[in-house]
Amino acid sequence: NSEEEAVQLFEGIRKNSQSDGIAPYADLVDHYQVVSKTFTYSKNSTYSATSEATLWLRGKGSYFQIQGVVGSATRIQTGTSTASWVQLYNNYNASFPSLSVDFVGSGYFTESRTHSGGGSVNINGFNLTGSTAYTDTYSSDTMSLIWTYKLYA
């Protein structure tokens, strides 16, 4: 399979290193790839958040290894109403070079709704967390964004 071929390619490169420790990396290519996964809030499917990362890959032909994570973040999914996303945690785990990376993030949505007074407007799956004369602020429960990116699925 592709994963085994990739491992064999990189093992061959390591074994063919010159005695002075310089490997023949001239034909290897660095590549940056954006990966992401979108999660829907279980209590209200109108709201979605995305975990996104930019990976640094190095390889040859169609065989690459992940050398590192250049950046990662969680954010609200484009088109998710007028809500805001509050990121609480964002991290990743892998022993580089690697063929996969584990991502872990969490956060919650907030949304303000204006009303004409005398009552509030409910949002399914949200709790009222603040109120002024004509504006109520709602927050969702904390949402976990946990996933694994595999270079060769």
What residue spans do the PLM features occupy?
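Short helix-loop boundary/capping segments
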Residues: Y32-D102
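N-terminal propeptides/leader regions of secreted preproproteins
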Residues: N1-F39
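A short, surface-exposed interaction/processing loop segment used at functional sites
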Residues: Q67-S72, G130-T132, D136, A153
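A short hydrophobic beta-strand element
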Residues: P97-R113
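Short, low-complexity, Pro/Ser/Thr/Gly-rich segments in the mature regions of secreted, periplasmic
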Residues: T137-A153
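Intrinsically disordered, low-complexity regions of eukaryotic proteins
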Residues: V29-Y32, T54, V104, Y138, ...
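Generic "edge-of-domain/loop-turn" microfeature
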Residues: T46, S62, T110-S116, Y152
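Glycine- and small hydrophobic-rich membrane-insertion segments that are intrinsically disordered
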Residues: E111-D136
